[in-house]
């Protein structure tokens, strides 16, 4: 009986890890000079290895998702270009 309870608890723990929400990590940078703004990506498809395209004050960068909210996904769109962005 105890092994069945343990198996159920183990399964629930596994499912809670798999089904947890994922977010872009919060950027530690609060501001960036316009000449330093660069986009490494515009959408998630531009990233590899399960990383996401996340927006920061210095541009869009591929980051691995985290379970802590606070970051922002890159909006992408037709106007998004990779490389240095001069406004």
From Swiss-Prot:
SUPFAM superfamilies reported in the protein's UniProt record: Elafin-like
Distribution of this protein across tissues and organs: Expressed by the venom gland.
InterPro entries cross-referenced by the UniProt entry: Elafin-like_sf
Domain WAP: 21-66
One Gene Ontology cellular component: extracellular region
Primary localization: secreted
Disulfide bonds: 24-54, 32-58, 41-53, 42-80, 47-62
GO molecular-function term, one example from the UniProt record: toxin activity
GO biological process: defense response to bacterium
Signal peptide boundaries: 1-20
Subcellular location: Secreted
Post-translational modification: Contains 5 disulfide bonds.
Keywords: Antibiotic, Antimicrobial, Disulfide bond, Secreted, Signal, Toxin
Role description: Has antibacterial activity.
Family from the record: Belongs to the venom protein 11 family. 01 (wap-1) subfamily.
Protein name: U15-lycotoxin-Ls1f
């Amino acid at each position: 009986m105890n092994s069945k309870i343990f198996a159920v608890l183990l399964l629930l723990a596994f499912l809670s890890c798999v089904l947890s929400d994922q977010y872009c990590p919060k950027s530690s940078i609060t501001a960036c000079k316009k000449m330093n703004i660069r986009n490494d990506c515009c959408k998630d498809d531009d990233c590899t290895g399960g990383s996401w395209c996340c927006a920061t004050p210095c541009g869009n960068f591929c980051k691995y998702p985290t379970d802590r909210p606070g970051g922002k996904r890159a909006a992408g769109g037709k106007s998004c270009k990779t490389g240095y962005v001069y406004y």
